Swiss-Prot record:
<dbReference type="GO" id="GO:0003712">
    <property type="term" value="F:transcription coregulator activity"/>
</dbReference>
<protein>
    <recommendedName>
        <fullName>Mediator of RNA polymerase II transcription subunit 18</fullName>
    </recommendedName>
</protein>
<keyword id="KW-0804">Transcription</keyword>
<comment type="subunit">
    <text>Component of the Mediator complex, which includes at least CDK8, MED4, MED6, MED11, MED14, MED17, MED18, MED20, MED21, MED22, MED27, MED28, MED30 and MED31.</text>
</comment>
<dbReference type="GO" id="GO:0006357">
    <property type="term" value="P:regulation of transcription by RNA polymerase II"/>
</dbReference>
<dbReference type="GO" id="GO:0070847">
    <property type="term" value="C:core mediator complex"/>
</dbReference>
<keyword id="KW-0010">Activator</keyword>
<keyword id="KW-0539">Nucleus</keyword>
<keyword id="KW-0805">Transcription regulation</keyword>
<dbReference type="GO" id="GO:0060261">
    <property type="term" value="P:positive regulation of transcription initiation by RNA polymerase II"/>
</dbReference>
<comment type="function">
    <text>Component of the Mediator complex, a coactivator involved in the regulated transcription of nearly all RNA polymerase II-dependent genes. Mediator functions as a bridge to convey information from gene-specific regulatory proteins to the basal RNA polymerase II transcription machinery. Mediator is recruited to promoters by direct interactions with regulatory proteins and serves as a scaffold for the assembly of a functional preinitiation complex with RNA polymerase II and the general transcription factors.</text>
</comment>
<dbReference type="GO" id="GO:0016592">
    <property type="term" value="C:mediator complex"/>
</dbReference>
<dbReference type="Pfam" id="PF09637">
    <property type="entry name" value="Med18"/>
</dbReference>
<dbReference type="GO" id="GO:0005634">
    <property type="term" value="C:nucleus"/>
</dbReference>
<comment type="similarity">
    <text>Belongs to the Mediator complex subunit 18 family.</text>
</comment>
<dbReference type="InterPro" id="IPR019095">
    <property type="entry name" value="Mediator_Med18"/>
</dbReference>
Length: 217
């Protein structure tokens, strides 16, 4: 019981002092398939652990929505699971993006947690419905607290096994530069801007206003 109380006190202290990483700072871009190897080479030179290969990933991502009577937009939750390896499911809540002209990055509230493999059934029983799903396959790099992913998005073909889905959504890779940090660390955006400058002209990382585009990421 003492351990539980201590954990609760630590969590309460972290929340009261804004230590919890609850904001995602994000820049996004894309690069053609024909140029992605050049970007990978650049990232290997810029990022940590240059002597080792970047971390590969091959994940299924599912977006679930719950309609709320007094809200203009549904509640969206993302559930991601690794394909081909044993790992916990990951559930993520993303708030509406805030695009401030004074900030170099897009900012949105973010909460992540690990889940058991019954999370999709649980959400369905709560009233959530499937919005969309896709497979993301690529590589992840680290530079300090920054995370850089280079992903190929793959369409899930009805009637085929997930490992047989082989229809890319586009002839390009999605490139994302992100940091999840506590509230009040505005210097994060400047760090990301400086790093993004080093990837030009291979890829132009920008803050994308999804409200203007009429959709969510």
């Amino acid at each position: 019981m003492a351990i539980v109380s201590s954990a609760r006190e630590s969590l309460s202290h972290a929340m009261n002092n804004r230590f919890l990483p609850n904001l995602e700072y994000l820049l996004q871009g894309s690069i053609l398939d024909s140029a992605v190897e050049h970007l990978m080479h650049r990232l290997k030179g810029l990022c940590d652990n240059v002597d080792t290969s970047p971390e590969p990933f091959h994940d299924l991502e599912v977006c679930m929505s719950l309609r709320q009577p007094n809200a203009n937009q549904p509640l969206l939750l993302r559930v991601r699971r690794a394909l081909g390896r044993d790992a916990p499911f990951q559930m993520r809540y993303l708030g509406n993006p805030e695009v401030d002209l004074r900030r170099p990055t897009l900012v949105r509230s973010c909460m992540d947690c690990a889940c058991t493999n019954g999370i999709l059934e649980f959400l369905t029983e709560m009233g959530f419905r499937l919005e969309f799903e896709y497979i993301a396959k690529g590589y992840m790099f680290r530079k300090g607290r920054m995370k850089i992913t280079v992903s190929k998005l793959i369409k899930i073909v009805p009637g085929k096994q997930q490992d047989m889905a082989n229809e890319p959504i586009s002839q390009s890779y999605i490139v994302e530069l992100s940091v999840v940090a506590p509230t009040g660390q505005e210097n994060v955006g400047e760090e990301m801007r400086v790093f993004a400058e080093q990837l030009k002209p291979l890829v132009q990382l920008e803050k994308i206003d999804y409200k203007r585009l009429g959709g969510m990421p």
